[in-house]
Amino acid sequence: MPAPGRGPRGPLLSMPGRRGALREPADFGSSLGAALALLLLLLPACCPVKAQNDTEPIVLEGKCLVVCDSSPSGDGAVTSSLGISVRSGSAKVAFSATRSTNHEPSEMSNRTMTIYFDQVLVNIGNHFDLASSIFVAPRKGIYSFSFHVVKVYNRQTIQVSLMQNGYPVISAFAGDQDVTREAASNGVLLLMEREDKVHLKLERGNLMGGWKYSTFSGFLVFPL
């Protein structure tokens, strides 16, 4: 009978790698699982993921792209689904009004001394009211205004003021007694808040001779 540790033809060879070989299947499975987990983690960063609708984030090459559903608001701004307000380039405001006749001022004009107009040439946005001859700002911004008020067959000096919310901002005068037609003209840039009002007021003199061809114009230069 062979002695312990010896084979029939010699000593048994020790196999130090045998136990390692027995563990090899378990080590291979652990490595494969870790590789699969890493692949799953890296998959969204290298492959596009299709969104279910237009407002969900889209992951592409490790960056998050947001598609916003935007719509214009009442004041001309565009508000996205994230609440970001962007001014719309298509929001324009402009008006120009004129006198087409020499009719005498109405009772309303005599009381308030508002210089009113009877014909609108341009009214983009409809923010100039012809009946009251008052312009109402639709939004905060820088506005340009100009006026040209003609007095006819009147030897009195007239003073015309552009009024913002009831207060005079600029004035113009016409008082040459040697001409039958003369105009008081001026222009200005104004910072206006939303709902601010602008109109023309006759501060001095009268327009009893008529004021045909007088004009009042304004437009939004840019919003703020």
Curated annotation (Swiss-Prot):
Pfam families: C1q. It comes from the Eukaryota. Glycans are attached at N53, N110. Brain (cerebellum), adrenal gland and spleen. In the adrenal gland, expressed at high levels in the zona glomerulosa and at low levels in the zona fasciculata-reticularis. Its main location: secreted. One of its GO terms (biological process) is spontaneous synaptic transmission. InterPro entries: C1q_dom, Cerebellin_Synaptic_Org, Tumour_necrosis_fac-like_dom. The keyword S-adenosyl-L-methionine does not apply. It is found in: Secreted. SUPFAM superfamilies: TNF-like. One of its GO terms (cellular component) is glutamatergic synapse. Residues 88-224 form the C1q domain. Residues 1-51 form the signal peptide. Keywords: Disulfide bond, Glycoprotein, Secreted, Signal. PANTHER family: CEREBELLIN-2, CEREBELLIN-RELATED. Acts as a synaptic organizer in specific subsets of neurons in the brain. Essential for long-term maintenance but not establishment of excitatory synapses. Functions as part of a trans-synaptic complex by binding to postsynaptic GRID1 and presynaptic neurexins. This interaction helps regulate the activity of NMDA and AMPA receptors at hippocampal synapses without affecting synapse formation. NRXN1B-CBLN2-GRID1 complex transduce presynaptic signals into postsynaptic NMDAR response. NRXN3B-CBLN2-GRID1 complex transduce presynaptic signals into postsynaptic AMPAR response. Homohexamer; disulfide-linked homotrimers. The trimers are assembled via the globular C1q domains. The trimers associate via N-terminal cysteine residues to form disulfide-linked hexamers. May form homooligomers or heterooligomers with CBLN1 and CBLN3 prior to secretion. Once secreted, does not interact with other CBLN family members. Interacts with GRID2, and more weakly with GRID1. Interacts with NRXN1 and NRXN2 long and short isoforms produced by alternative promoter usage. Weakly interacts with NRXN3 short isoform and not at all with NRXN3 long isoform. This is Cerebellin-2.
